């Protein structure tokens, strides 16, 4: 068993490979195998020919690493230096359409639910971090949120009693380290580049492309689209619930995300 792996991390490790990758499932590889080998050689690359964006490694309290880390050997020491952990062996591959702020919120929500509540830093700190992340994804982020997230993360890491609390901030810290520009877009520009955060998405109809087929108006569950047959239609942004039904159903590609 010790004949494979690295000097500091011998043997093999089982990982659960999932996400936006062609081949998913349980795999067992020698410690020190690179993420590139796992994602592309074993996983078959990214689905639908899209670009790789990140991989979340180590379970819910693991870290999100980028293309720059693809040749990093997956062993205990290397991942710790990169701000991640091997943890439970989860490997969630994400493509270019993934919002990293939303991902951080998703994992922080899981961590909040898993906290036993015994120590205040984990119980209250993670809840506060989740509140901030939720507010940011809903378009209500404000200056100082990034700094507060980092401050809370440091406090939780240093003060929590168990391993869950000490690693709980990893999803936020790693996405801040590698994708801070996305946080700033959400907070200051009120924009989600992937369109994942619906509260930050505004749908508009291009009058030069719209044929007035009325399909969007008929399918809109909120009755937010009006217009006459064979004439450009219009979306009432106050009524729009941002479900995306109009965009996905438009046969002419006339509906855009502003």
Predicted feature descriptions by range:
Residues 1-202:
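Redox cofactor-anchoring modules in respiratory/redox and cofactor-processing assemblies
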Residues 35-38, 51, 115, 128-129, ...:
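Extended, hydrophobic alpha-helical segments in both membrane/secreted and soluble proteins
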Residues 43-44, 139, 214, 223, ...:
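Glycine-centered helix-boundary capping/hinge motifs
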Residues 107-110, 191-212, 223-242, 253-258:
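Ferredoxin-like iron-sulfur electron-transfer modules
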Residues 32, 116-122, 162, 192, ...:
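Short cysteine clusters
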């Amino acid at each position: 068993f010790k004949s494979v792996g690295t000097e500091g991390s011998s043997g093999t490790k089982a990982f659960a490979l999932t996400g936006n990758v062609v081949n998913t499932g349980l795999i067992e590889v020698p410690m020190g195998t690179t993420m590139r080998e796992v994602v592309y050689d074993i996983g078959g690359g990214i689905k639908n020919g899209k670009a790789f964006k990140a991989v979340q490694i180590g379970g819910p309290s693991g870290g999100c690493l980028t293309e720059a880390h693809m040749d990093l050997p997956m062993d205990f020491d290397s991942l710790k230096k990169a701000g991640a952990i091997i943890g439970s062996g989860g490997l969630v591959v994400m493509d270019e359409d993934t919002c990293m702020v939303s991902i951080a919120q998703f994992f922080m929500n899981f961590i909040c639910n898993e906290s036993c509540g015994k120590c205040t830093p984990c119980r209250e700190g993670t809840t506060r971090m989740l509140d901030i992340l939720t507010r940011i994804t809903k378009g209500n982020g404000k200056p100082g949120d990034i700094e507060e997230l980092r401050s809370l993360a440091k406090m939780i890491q240093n003060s929590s009693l168990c391993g869950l609390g000490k690693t709980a901030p990893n999803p936020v810290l790693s996405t801040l380290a590698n994708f801070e520009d996305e946080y700033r877009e959400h907070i200051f520009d009120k924009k989600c580049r992937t369109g994942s955060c619906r509260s930050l998405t505004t749908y508009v109809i291009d009058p030069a492309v719209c044929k007035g087929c009325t399909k969007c108006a008929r399918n809109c569950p909120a009755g937010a689209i009006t217009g006459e047959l064979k004439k450009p239609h219009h979306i009432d942004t106050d009524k729009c619930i941002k479900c995306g039904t109009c965009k996905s159903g438009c046969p002419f590609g006339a509906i855009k995300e502003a």
